[in-house]
From Swiss-Prot:
Protein name: Hemoglobin subunit beta
Lineage: Eukaryota, Metazoa, Chordata, Craniata, Vertebrata
GO cellular component: blood microparticle; haptoglobin-hemoglobin complex; hemoglobin complex
Domain of life of the native organism: Eukaryota
Tissue-level expression: Red blood cells.
Keyword entries, A-Z: Heme, Iron, Metal-binding, Oxygen transport, Transport
GO annotation, biological process: hydrogen peroxide catabolic process
Similarity section: Belongs to the globin family.
Length: 147
């Protein structure tokens, strides 16, 4: 269980209030698939992922990126019990999809990079530290079923 200060909760809530899901989600997932091409194996049904332009222009990648980013809303709503909030998704990713849990870290790094680029100077070191703590809690919860 993660302990959150009032300031951390306020910071996470503020970040989510400014998220442009339709922009950040597709960019983050595209970046992950381009920078870490082995992650593409989980998206074989998405069609053409042969190069960066194809990935960036792929509607299924964009749609799933938005879905993933909205998946973080669950953690925002249940910050005091993130592990339980993601129990079903952890089971899905480990038992049905067989996703290597190390990929959660790769995607979270890409989300952070895209968010930092979007927010610019507003994404201070303190803001990043809090956001990384949040993503770390989500990644841990998603990986729980693997332990």
């Amino acid at each position: 269980m993660v302990n959150w200060t009032k300031t951390e909760k306020a910071t996470i809530t503020d970040i989510f209030s400014h998220l442009d899901y339709d922009d950040i989600g597709p960019k983050a997932l595209s970046r992950c698939l381009i920078v870490y091409p082995w992650t593409q194996r989980y998206f074989s049904g998405f069609g053409n992922l042969y190069n960066a332009a194809a990935i960036i222009g792929n509607a299924k990648v964009a749609e799933h990126g938005i879905k993933v980013l909205h998946g973080l809303d669950l953690g925002l709503k249940k910050m005091d019990n993130i592990e339980a909030a993601y129990a079903d998704l952890s089971s899905l990713h480990s038992e049905k999809l067989h996703v290597d849990p190390d990929n959660f870290k790769l995607l979270s790094d890409c989300i952070t990079i895209v968010l930092a680029a979007k927010l610019g100077s507003a994404f201070t070191a303190e803001t990043q530290a809090t956001f990384q703590k949040f993503l770390g809690a989500v990644m841990s919860a998603l990986g729980k079923q693997y332990h």
